[in-house]
Swiss-Prot record:
Name recorded for this polypeptide: Mu/omega-theraphotoxin-Mb1b
Main location: secreted
Keyword Disulfide bond assigned: yes
Pfam family name, one: Toxin_12
GO CC terms of this entry: extracellular region
Serine amide sites (modified residues): S38
Tissue expression as described in the entry: Expressed by the venom gland.
Note: Possibly exists in two forms, due to cis-trans isomerization of Pro-5 or Pro-22.
Record InterPro entries: Huwentoxin-1
Amino acid sequence: GVDKPGCRYMFGGCVQDDDCCPHLGCKRKGLYCAWDAS
């Protein structure tokens, strides 16, 4: 994820990893942000 205004927190809706806040990635099966292993 990225640090930008409006970034999605845990379980926020997303289409891609860049929609999520830092340390979060988009889980495409559920279209929500969750912890990214990286």
